[in-house]
C-alpha cells in the first residue's frame, strides 16, 4: 500500500527560490509521467525522509498536491548534497499500476565470505540490479549471502535470477560480487604472466673479427 505524502505547487523554481525553499525545510521537486505534464512542487524534507524510510527507495508513494489529485508515484531521481547529506531535488514519476516498469534495486550483501577469512578481498562490482515488473511488485532490495564464497569465487546475475521474484534485466555474465586473491598473490600471478609472455631471446653468433691487414 502506498504511503501518503503532501506536496505544494511551486510555479517558480529558480535558483534564488529553491535556496529559500530549502532554508524553510522543503525540498524542490517535480512530478511527471507518461500521462502527466511536468509540474514543479516541493515537499517537506522531514516528511519525505519518513516516507522513504517506511516504503523504501523503490516504494510507492501517494503524492497529494495541495488537497488536489493524488498521484501514485515512485522516486525516479534523488539529488543530495555530497557533504551535508541534505536533499537538493527530487524527481517523482507517476506510474501506471497496470503497466510494467524498469527500476534499479539496491543490492545488500550478508554474511562473511569464507575467502575473506583466508586472506582474500571481497569486491562488490554492482550495487544495483535492474528489474522489470509491475510497480507494486518491485522489491525494496535484493539480498545476497556471500558466506560460501572462497577466493576466486563470484556471484553473477545468472546466480541471482532464480532467487528474484521479478524479471532481471541485466545480462547473465555480469558479476555482482567476487572474492579476489590477496594483493601479494595477485602480484606474483601478474609477474608470472609477464614472464611467460616475454619473447625468448636467441643469442646471435658473434661475427669473427676481421683479420688485421698485413702491413
Swiss-Prot record:
GO terms for molecular function: 5S rRNA binding; structural constituent of ribosome. Residues 174-215 are annotated as: Disordered. Gene3D superfamilies: Ribosomal protein L25, beta domain (2.170.120.20), Ribosomal Protein L25, Chain P (2.40.240.10). One of its GO terms (cellular component) is cytosolic large ribosomal subunit. Residues 186-215 have a biased composition (Acidic residues). It comes from the Bacteria. Keywords: Ribonucleoprotein, Ribosomal protein, RNA-binding, rRNA-binding. One of its GO terms (biological process) is translation. This is one of the proteins that binds to the 5S RNA in the ribosome where it forms part of the central protuberance. PANTHER family: RIBOSOMAL PROTEIN L25/GLN-TRNA SYNTHETASE, ANTI-CODON-BINDING DOMAIN-CONTAINING PROTEIN (PTHR33284), RIBOSOMAL PROTEIN L25_GLN-TRNA SYNTHETASE, ANTI-CODON-BINDING DOMAIN-CONTAINING PROTEIN (PTHR33284:SF1). Belongs to the bacterial ribosomal protein bL25 family. CTC subfamily. Part of the 50S ribosomal subunit; part of the 5S rRNA/L5/L18/L25 subcomplex. Contacts the 5S rRNA. Binds to the 5S rRNA independently of L5 and L18. This is Large ribosomal subunit protein bL25. It comes from Halalkalibacterium halodurans (strain ATCC BAA-125 / DSM 18197 / FERM 7344 / JCM 9153 / C-125) (Bacillus halodurans).
Amino acid at each position: 500500500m502506498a504511503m501518503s505524502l503532501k506536496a505544494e505547487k511551486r510555479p517558480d523554481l529558480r535558483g534564488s527560490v529553491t535556496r529559500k525553499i530549502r532554508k524553510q525545510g522543503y525540498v524542490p521537486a517535480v512530478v511527471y509521467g507518461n500521462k502527466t505534464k511536468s509540474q514543479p512542487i516541493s515537499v517537506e524534507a522531514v516528511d519525505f525522509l519518513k516516507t522513504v524510510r517506511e516504503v523504501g527507495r523503490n516504494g510507492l508513494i501517494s503524492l497529494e498536491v495541495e488537497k488536489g489529485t493524488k498521484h501514485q508515484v515512485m522516486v525516479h531521481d534523488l539529488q543530495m548534497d555530497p557533504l551535508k547529506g541534505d536533499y537538493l531535488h527530487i524527481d517523482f514519476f507517476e506510474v501506471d499500476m497496470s503497466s510494467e516498469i524498469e527500476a534499479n534495486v539496491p543490492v545488500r550483501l550478508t554474511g562473511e565470505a569464507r575467502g575473506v577469512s583466508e586472506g582474500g578481498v571481497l569486491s562488490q562490482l554492482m550495487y544495483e540490479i535492474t528489474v522489470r515488473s509491475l510497480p507494486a511488485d518491485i522489491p525494496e532490495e535484493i539480498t545476497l549471502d556471500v558466506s560460501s564464497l572462497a577466493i576466486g569465487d563470484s556471484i553473477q546475475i545468472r546466480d541471482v535470477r532464480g532467487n528474484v521474484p521479478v524479471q532481471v534485466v541485466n545480462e547473465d555474465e555480469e558479476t555482482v560480487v567476487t572474492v579476489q586473491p590477496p594483493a601479494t598473490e595477485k602480484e606474483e600471478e601478474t609477474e608470472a604472466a609477464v614472464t611467460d609472455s616475454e619473447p625468448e631471446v636467441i643469442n646471435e653468433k658473434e661475427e669473427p673479427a676481421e683479420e688485421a691487414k698485413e702491413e
